[in-house]
Amino acid sequence: MALLDLKQFYELREGCDDKGILVMDGDWLVFQAMSAAEFDASWEEEIWHRCCDHAKARQILEDSIKSYETRKKAWVGAPIVLAFTDSVNWRKELVDPNYKANRKATKKPVGYFEFLEALFEREEFYCIREPMLEGDDVMGVIASNPSAFGARKAVIISCDKDFKTIPNCDFLWCTTGNILTQTKETADWWHLFQTIKGDMTDGYSGIPGWGDTAEGFLNDPFIVEPVESVLKSGKNKGQTVTKWVKRAPDATETLWDCIKSIGAKAGMTEQEIIKQGQMARILRFEEYNYIDKEIYLWTPRS
């Protein structure tokens, strides 16, 4: 089976009605397998080479996939998707050219692209790569609406915590081994958490000064607003000063109004905060048209 895009995958899956589908992080699985199969060799004195045993890497990859597939009885025999990242990233093109710019270039394992070419011909897996999308986005599009791709339920399999932002699926978080059941409510919460906290690894800072304390704010949101007052004593008597005062939101104010207010205190405009949210967003089914390849950027009202 050749490498597919999402439209081709959709067409192949028309008429299917599987109980579940396993959506795996192909980028991560292949990199891990090949890295574990690398070794140094010297063919002549003083000259060393980095080598990769592709047969060993292939076996490691197959064993990893098998271990996840058999994690639960209900997953055995389910269709398997391996998602891969395109060379062009929509976040750089449409949102911020500096997205992931501070990441050090990671050298691919030896023979990486040749290994992929062979993998793409395997019949056991659906290998999918979509123009301008990261593998994460491919996974998000499929997992957030598996019924569009011939399955009643999707399970995401990855070590990346950012998949907590994908609704309507289960997520096997390989870092902890936990299986998380995700709803739209929990996924939206995690997306806003990432928007406020930021992710310097991916090159977006969030709202300065918050970090992990964004959790407490989202669980008990509030408004902060500037209040001016005139000093009545001291050497600066008569001067006007501005303090940011915290209060509960009124009945007309939304969570987004609260987020805007803490952003304003940090010197950010609403559009700058939205930009953080767009970089934090893994695409969901309704945010990508795989027929005409159109991306619908997230807004707080979308």
Swiss-Prot record:
GO molecular function terms here?
Answer: DNA binding; double-stranded DNA 5'-3' DNA exonuclease activity
Q: Does the keyword Hydrolase apply?
A: yes
Statement: the UniProt record of this protein carries the keyword Hydrolase: yes
List the EC numbers from the record: 3.1.11.3
Q: Which UniProt keywords apply?
A: Exonuclease, Hydrolase, Nuclease
Name the SUPFAM superfamilies on file. Answer: PIN domain-like
For this protein, what reaction is catalysed? Exonucleolytic cleavage in the 5'- to 3'-direction to yield nucleoside 5'-phosphates
* Organism domain of life: Viruses
Enzyme group, top EC level? Answer: hydrolase
> Which InterPro entries does the record associate with it?
5-3_exonucl_a-hlix_arch_N, PIN-like_dom_sf
Function summary? This enzyme is essential for phage DNA replication; it is believed to function in the removal of DNA-linked RNA primers. It is also necessary for host DNA degradation and phage genetic recombination.
Q: Under what name is this protein listed?
A: Exodeoxyribonuclease
Species name: Enterobacteria phage T3 (Bacteriophage T3)
Q: Which gene encodes it?
A: 6
